[in-house]
A protein has these predicted regions:
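Tandem CBS (Cystathionine beta-synthase) repeat/Bateman regulatory domains
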Residues: 1-147
Length: 147
């Protein structure tokens, strides 16, 4: 139920999140709070698709031993399996994107917005530690909360 979903409550402005004054303020589901839905590189694409569908997301971080190793997107899965549906049983690492936008948590919102023109998401890092993904929707939610 949305009433008991803290992320929905935050998005609607009913509860306040801790503010850091950096890109962490824009991350919709912080990884450090175990809020990030992820897959592993050896999970099958069917698992990734189910998690994407159930969460209503278009991309998921691929984590290996606590380290961000890639991003799997709906588009990447489609491109990989189109014409070969049996490939839904292939490991995520075969279809994931290994090259993607990464920004340090201290990067400016201007840099983030510029990057989101190229790619619909950016991975935020604190040094080598994965903080979370920021999507265009997260930026819109952040801007709405500024009003």
């Amino acid at each position: 139920s949305k009433l008991f979903n803290d992320f929905w409550m935050e998005d609607q402005g009913f509860i306040e999140r801790e503010s850091f004054g950096d890109l962490r303020d824009l991350v919709g589901r912080p990884h450090g709070e175990q809020a990030t839905i992820t897959v592993g590189p050896t999970d099958v694409l069917t698992t990734a698709h189910n998690r994407l569908r159930n969460a209503g997301f278009s991309q998921l971080p691929v984590m290996d031993g606590g380290r961000l190793v890639g991003i799997v997107t709906e588009d990447a899965i489609i491109q990989f399996v189109y014409g070969h549906p049996e490939l839904m049983a292939a490991p995520v690492e075969d279809a994931m994107e290994s090259v993607f936008i990464k920004l340090d948590k201290t990067a400016s919102v201007n840099s983030l917005v510029a990057m989101l023109r190229v790619q619909p998401y950016a991975a935020v890092l604190d040094g080598e530690d994965f903080v979370g993904l920021i999507t265009r929707s997260d930026v819109l939610n952040y801007l709405r909360r500024q009003v």
